Amino acid sequence: MSSEYGQNIKLTVFGESHASAVGVLIEGLPAGEAIDEERIMNFMRRRMGGKAWSTPRKEEDRPEFLCGLLGGKTTGAALCAIIRNSNIRPSDYENMKNVPRPSHADYPAFVKYGGANDRSGGGQFSGRLTAPLCVAGAISEQILARKGINVAAHLSRAAGIDDTPFDPCDPDNGIFEKLKTKLFPTIDDTAGEEMIKKILEAKESLDSVGGIVECAVTGLGAGLGDPIFGSAESRISSMIFGIGGVRGIEFGAGFSAADMTGSVHNDPYCLIDSTVKTVTNNHGGIIGGLTSGMPIIFRAAFKPTPSIGLPQRSVDLDSLEETRLEIRGRHDPCIAVRAVPCVEAAAAVTVLDMVLGK
């Protein structure tokens, strides 16, 4: 199934935007792992709406664990959690019942499912499905942290404004935990304020903006992953593209490598405390599909939120006539902001899956 992921742990997300709940099933977690539910809630709060620069829709997003967790520890059985959808307004989508929203999955989903799919809030294509992903990511991060592996992300670009990038060789440098407690997820607060200003301007204009999320993973040894189709990049990318709105991904120097010479792009090896490292990290922590022991650094690009208030051209699928559409509902003027913990969660689940297969 397309909603399943993983080789050593099996992750399944389920539900729809305006269904009674969304949820996650995780199979293969080691037994006896301590899981702090309050830390999970801290993670979930980073994704919540209700802020000036996000959707007004705000859910509590408190997971209900149905099985797999007992006395604060994993039992070794499949772990299942659901998150109730309480703040829903299907009436916002009545005028779009037969009119596909531009750049949403409405039309191809209509063709695939013959119109039987739930289109309220995007149904199974909604960003609401990232809530259960964040539950899985929060659990994965706690397990990884005990192995000395840490994951963090920030909004590196939005509306043409750039944040300070991670140091590719030492991305943590004391900022990982700070990022996870910030209301707006940038390293540079001044850049964050400029981004917020631009996002609010777009919102006021009934428009939206895109952005880029940068993610880093530290503490991984060399040799994880597989060559060719099982590469570490492939596995991370597959998971990241499961987040709605992602348009591209790059590792290390990424597409700028195309403009470099080999002498500039190559990362010379060195010894640090008798451990093989590289002087630079243009490869982003992965070479030949295998982790190199350097931090994994990647960036995911998000398109502007397609749900905008401006009139847009579309087609009535019942009458097969062109029409104009004005989208109602509650939407993010920049989905990249709330996607930061989602990217982090996706990376954490993927890395845990690789680590457990070592």
Task: Briefly describe each language-model feature range.
Residues 1-358:
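Generic N-terminal targeting/processing segments that precede catalytic cores or assembly contacts
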